[in-house]
Amino acid sequence: LDGREVAVKVQYPGIAAAIAADMDNSETIAMLLGVVFPGLDPQELVEELRARINEELDYENEAANVGIFADYYRGHPAIWIPAVIPELSSTTVLTTEFVAGERFEAIYERSQEERDRVAETLYRFVFRSLNRQYTFNGDPHPGNYLLADDGRVAFIDFGLVKHFEADEVEQFARLIRAMLDRDASEFRRVAEDVAVLRPNAPFTDDEIY
């Protein structure tokens, strides 16, 4: 309305109802997961999946996630989170700043130095968000990144975001340390502590690691 260029994401009509109907089969999904992955809690996995899908279908929830990341990275020299325009957004419509730039695939045509710089930006975004904000963007793929004309990397999809407590992030750090130390027993202990693995799951430590 004021002449700004914007990007508009519109939810396909009926998609929420269709997905909800599919998720009604969650008991069957849980049973199959229990057979394939006997060391995991299948019902917990299915409930987590259901919660994340419901959140991803709610564009007001996504707008709130964008706000968290945009506030944190505002002014960052390498990372751009396009801000939401709330008066043009709703549960099924999300309107943000427009990003002038190229699709992420264009990185393959750039110099090795530029590719290294962009890779470092992605790495820093993921782990800084997790370790400082206790948030994780759960949909990291090239379609959700843009190479902005000003040199920054723009991140454009925040429908699938997980928010953690500080102690949960510390447990993830313990998992990573165990992997780096090649300590299979410690890796198993931490995996059980964070409920990724059932206690006494029918696998050896080395198989889990």
Predicted regions located by residue number:
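Conserved catalytic cores of large enzyme domains
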Residues: L1-Y209
